[in-house]
Regions:
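A short, active-site helix/loop in glycosyltransferases that binds the activated sugar's phosphate group
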Residues: 140-166, 174-178
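Short His-centered aromatic/hydrophobic patch
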Residues: 85-92, 110
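A conserved mid-protein helix/loop that constitutes part of the nucleotide-sugar donor-binding site
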Residues: 15-20, 197, 201-222, 241
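Conserved acidic donor-binding segment of nucleotide-sugar-dependent glycosyltransferases
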Residues: 302, 311-314, 318-325, 333-339
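Glycosyltransferase donor-sugar binding loop
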Residues: 35-41, 174, 202, 228-241
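Membrane-proximal helix-turn-helix segments that form the acceptor-binding/catalytic region
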Residues: 72, 126-145
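Aromatic "clamp/platform" in nucleotide-sugar-dependent glycosyltransferases that forms part
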Residues: 261, 280
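Short hydrophobic beta-strand element within catalytic cores of glycosyltransferases
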Residues: 297-301
Length: 365
């Protein structure tokens, strides 16, 4: 039995990858179960979903403790099993719940850059020390570490596991044909399909995504030419207010829209004139694969996970320093110009689901 664990089936990149992985492994004839701490969310047809708790707790620490106890009982009931903790936020629960269970093989999928190593990135101070300690703990405990990007192999805490042959690199993949089918829809926003051109960014309104630098870059671009910027993504009121206040101070508030989250990003990507991923750090960004699938001109930060590899070292999209607003503005200007824009072309064909499935099946068998 393969148990795929995440805390909840929320609208995140990790959860999208869990659904893909569950479906692919089940299609290969492997017994798979989705286990979450919290109920709800979109599951996978043909794959059982077991929620450990009846609902969320007012206290997140208490919720985590209850999830640990419930996951341990669930693992004990399953006997021999492979536990795949599919995202960084669930590793602590998976580690604590599985200690001392000899019939449980533990695989930790490192879904993001734990060390946040890009120059200028917010490191989190004491939080960085905690993340380092957790990385070392996972590396010692794991039967396998699965890294979603080759750059994560440079994490010092994983060096011992790599020497022991416990590290595998399995990047995310995408069904490009399905993405193109989903992109075939009406224009999703009043700004799209007309002038001035629209730049699209997608991601939680969080420090990791580096939207403050993007706004600074967009302000530089707006002094050179007309353009508009749409940022899709989940946010708290405070984050949204902060970005709107920055946009107002920069004089670009009328050309910025923050519509929140949407169920289907592909029509947005297909009708955008350029896509930008300014993140300080990532793992293997789904949204970059999604943009590549619909062949929109792309600007991405070099530190956004495996963006350098995905964009073939700049041959299929432009790469920039995430701290350099002027360079980001210049790259956006080039990608909005039909004479200089670089598109991904068929690069996405190198990152299909067959390669992802084959790699996981080899590891699990």
């Amino acid at each position: 039995m393969i148990i795929l664990y995440v805390h909840a089936l929320a609208a995140t990149g990790v959860v999208r990858n869990v659904r893909i992985l569950a479906a692919e492994l089940a299609a290969r004839g492997l017994a798979v179960e989705l286990v979450t701490a919290l109920p709800g969310g979109e599951g996978v047809t043909g794959v059982p979903h077991h929620a450990l708790l009846a609902g969320p707790y007012p206290s997140r620490p208490r919720e985590k403790l209850q999830a640990i106890a419930a996951l341990r009982r669930h693992l004990q009931s399953r006997g021999q099993a492979t536990l795949i903790s599919a995202g960084n936020h669930g590793h602590g629960t998976a580690w604590a719940a599985s200690q001392g269970l000899r019939d449980v093989r533990r695989i930790y999928r490192i879904s993001n850059d734990i060390m946040r190593s890009a120059v200028g990135a917010p490191s989190g101070g004491l939080g960085r020390l905690g993340r380092t300690a957790m990385a070392r703990l996972l590396a010692r405990d794991a039967d396998h570490l699965v890294l979603v990007s080759p750059i994560l192999a440079d994490t010092p805490a994983f060096a011992g596991a790599a020497r022991a042959g416990k590290v595998a690199v399995i990047p995310n993949g995408i069904d490009a044909d399905a993405a193109r089918f989903l992109a075939d829809g009406p224009v999703p926003h009043r700004w799209m399909g007309r002038t001035p051109p629209v730049i699209l960014a997608i991601g939680r309104l969080a420090l990791q995504k580096n939207f403050a630098t993007l706004l600074a870059a967009f302000a530089i671009l707006r002094r050179q030419r007309p353009a508009r910027l749409i940022i899709l993504g989940e946010s708290r009121d405070r984050a949204c207010y902060s970005l709107r206040a920055q946009a107002k101070a920069l004089g670009i508030a009328d050309d910025l829209d923050l519509p929140g989250t949407v169920d289907n990003v592909f029509p947005w990507l297909a009708h955008a004139d350029a896509f930008v991923l300014p993140s300080w750090w990532e793992g293997s960004p789904n949204v970059l694969l999604e943009a590549m699938a619909v062949d929109v001109p792309i600007v991405a930060s070099r530190s956004a996970g495996n963006a350098v590899d995905l964009l073939d070292h700049g041959r299929c999209g432009l790469l920039v320093d995430p701290a350099d607003a002027a360079a980001m503005a210049d790259a956006l200007a080039r990608q909005l110009d039909l004479a200089t824009a670089i598109r991904p072309g068929d690069r996405i064909d190198h990152f299909g689901l067959d390669a992802l499935s084959d790699a996981w099946v080899r590891l699990l068998r």
